[in-house]
Amino acid sequence: IGVIATAVIATLVPKDRGETAPLAFRDELKVVGRPQVLLGLLMTVLGFGGMFTVYTYIQPLLTEVAGFAESAVSPILLVFGVGMIVGNLLGGKFADRKLMPALLATLATLTLVMGLMTFALHSQWAMVLFVGLLGAAAFATVSPLQLWVLQKAEGAQSLASSLNIGAFNLGNAFGAWLGGAVIMHGAGLGALTWVGALVPLSALLVALYSVSLQKRSDRLLVAAESNAA
């Protein structure tokens, strides 16, 4: 699989022919410290954290709440995997076309899917469907989140990309912790989906704030150019 992946990357990924000199590490740190970059990293943590609030505990959700046999868990997770592939493809296409709408739409979709999953917990067929939708909705956010951070970190994309991967992993840990806290404090497995939905909802609110900052910055730039003319 690794050899195939390497061949595909070498064939399809465009070669960077730019001659731009890399920034010094100190300057890269200044770039990734920009408010828009930090907001993007926060969106990544919250966006993926919500999904892992549920996914970390997907086995007991399926067996203890939905009533599936243990042997059914692995086939159902294959449905999640198919959803991941579909979500990655769709998220990448949407992000390439219109990044800002793609970012907002994918976070909103993830919030909606997780919220509605609350009402599917006791229906086996509905749960299979929503497990697939969860995979698709969660991984549709990956490309928009990554591209948003890279665009806002112009000149320090390598460092920003590394930090964003770390943000995805931090989201994984945060989601697992949050799900465990929900269960430990007695809310039960059934509360994981709606509590988890609040996390990408908060990511969506951060995204809306980030977009408003971007629009304000664009207006100021246009005004400055008009005054200079």
Residue ranges and their predicted role:
Residues 35-78, 82-85, 99:
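Extracytoplasmic gate region of multi-pass secondary transporters
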Residues 1-19, 206-211:
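C-terminal membrane-cytosol helix-exit motif in multi-pass small-molecule transporters
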Residues 148-159:
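Paired intracellular helix-loop junctions of major facilitator superfamily
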